[in-house]
Amino acid sequence: MAIFSHRLIKCYDRTMNTITKAIIPVAGWGTRMLPITKSIEKCMLPVGTRPVVDYIVQDIIRAGVKDVYFVVGEQSTQVQSYYRSNIQLNDYLRRAGKQDKLPLVAPLRDVRIHFLTQPGTGGYGTSIPVGLASEFIDPGELAFVVMGDQFFWRGDGGSNAADLAELVEARGLSAGLLGNPVEEALIPQTGIIETDQQGNFVRIIEKPKLEEAPSNLSNSSFYVLNKEIFELARTLPANPQRGEFELTDAINAYIAGGGIIAVGEAKGDYMECGSPSGWLRANNAMARLLAN
């Protein structure tokens, strides 16, 4: 595991209720975005003037995260480069009288960035990076897990990670996920979350008929997970129908064992950047939002 320490100038007290770790899986090849993802990692595709993944990082930092674990592919270099200091660039900006740009390229303050390498051979699926990170989550500890090819833009300066952590704590639970409210026309095209009367997770119904949909919330792949779910992600076999190691299988196993997962509603504009059309929509939307 590689680690970059970014100017740790303060010491923060940690409480039992503070979630200080986040896992961001970014090892995918981004095949839907080929050929550009042959040379640009999917999570580093620009939306506006920032890479996709940095919008996620900014959200979780606002929630108090101090350790960010990127699960990267074996050939990954760009995420590492983005989050470390570039001395030559800094020197150039100073010489050119562009010191006002230095804060834009400065390393994150008071945050440690870790890199875990996901092997290119072996299992495939969303539970693989979560299982790899399991050893860095202590018993009784909670961590955010956010997939690295999508984000929510919030013009209010708020944090979906902070909102989800507050919801989990308010319900006295140790796990939660955010649902993304979708338009009616999209409900038959996606997995829709079913909740119980308390607003806790029951299951995901894939592509339901509109009249049979239990809600308008799709899974946004934005989680608070406990150590037990991390271990389930590490140990469960591949899904027998699809042959992939799926995080939803670990979540379903946790529910089947009596676990309870809170469901919240994400705020902001959803930016899906894993497909050409989604990435273009995200850039168009950000251009409009930033122009206002």
Name each region found by the language model.
Residues W29, D149-Q150, P276:
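Active-site metal-binding loops of divalent metal-dependent hydrolases
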Residues I3, R7-Y12:
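Short, positively charged and aromatic/hydrophobic N-terminal segments
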Residues M44, I193-T195, V263:
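A structural signal for short hydrophobic beta-strand segments in well-ordered beta-sheet cores
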Residues V79, L89-Y92, K101-T195, R234:
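Conserved beta-loop-beta/alpha segment of the NTase-like Rossmann-fold superfamily
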Residues K21, K66-V68, L142, S174, ...:
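Residues at the starts of beta-strands that form the adenosine-phosphate
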Residues F144, G157-G158, A162-A165, E169, ...:
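Catalytic-core segments of class I nucleotidyltransferases/pyrophosphorylases
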Residues N17-R95, Q99, I113, G157-S159:
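N-terminal glycine-rich phosphate-binding loop and ensuing alpha1 helix
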